[in-house]
Amino acid sequence: MRVRTRTGRRAAGALTAAALLLSALSLTGCEADGGHRGSSGRPGAPDGLTDGAPSGREPASAHHPGRGGPVRPAARPDPAPELFRELPGLGPRTREELPDDSGQVLVVTGTGHDSSRSTVVLYERVAADKKNHRTRSGTGDAGAAWRAGASWMAHNGLRGWTERHHQGDLRSPIGVFGLTGSGGRRKDPGTLLPYDHAPRAFTIHGSGSEGEPLSGSFGYVVAIDYNRRSGTSPLDPVRPMGGHRGGGIWLHVDHGGPTQGCVSLSRKNMKSLLLTLDPRRRPVVVMGDSASLAR
């Protein structure tokens, strides 16, 4: 399957009827399976995630009583973004897997090896500016640093993480993977990634592990380059390592519970991610539980 470009975003309509009728459930590791129970305790929740605030931003303070009623303190400008010489939480073995020319790294950190909860932060490589930014010390290129974006809550596989993913194990794969293709039921929000707008093919029905509806989960999708051909549509069924090693591992819209192996974010954050990722910066995702990433 050839790489889709901006001029070919409507090519999904030219797919054969058989390809369109192929259920998204058979292509993605996030297939519905109502026989498993997760740990969220929020069955049926439409989102289930709380957006994190950008690093360094203070929460709103309480009102102060006065003659004229409640008074808010004067607004303060947001502090300068914090820069890092090294990507936080990644050990030497993990850092060695990162491409030298990657300028965008999405770090997905699981709370535990068997946990379905994780935190997502997008880091972008920038020139270090010691005068205007706080920079944490560490080893690395003295002329470059990593700027952290907002911290987002996410779900991953129901049973946590694994270094050797197999079809149906309900765990998300640990490793560093490219982010080279996107798509979804919703129209292209303006991403620079190749976007496959295929409403019928990205339709999903049924319930998740906690009984929550899965409808809308594939409104926005970014394919994670695990066991797939780089640069193709997320719907590409080819599995270079074989079907037994699973596939269809995506970043997609959260449905309020654990996934079958994908990583899910709120729809707002998925849209923000799509608008930020730039293929010219060779974006990658590094994902796994915190202990595995720290090695």
Go through the PLM ranges and name each one:
Residues 30-253, 275, 290-295:
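Cell wall/extracellular polymer interaction/catalysis modules
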Residues 249-252, 258-295:
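Extracellularly exposed regions in secreted/surface proteins, prominently low-complexity, repeat-rich
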Residues 1-34:
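Secretory targeting and sorting signals
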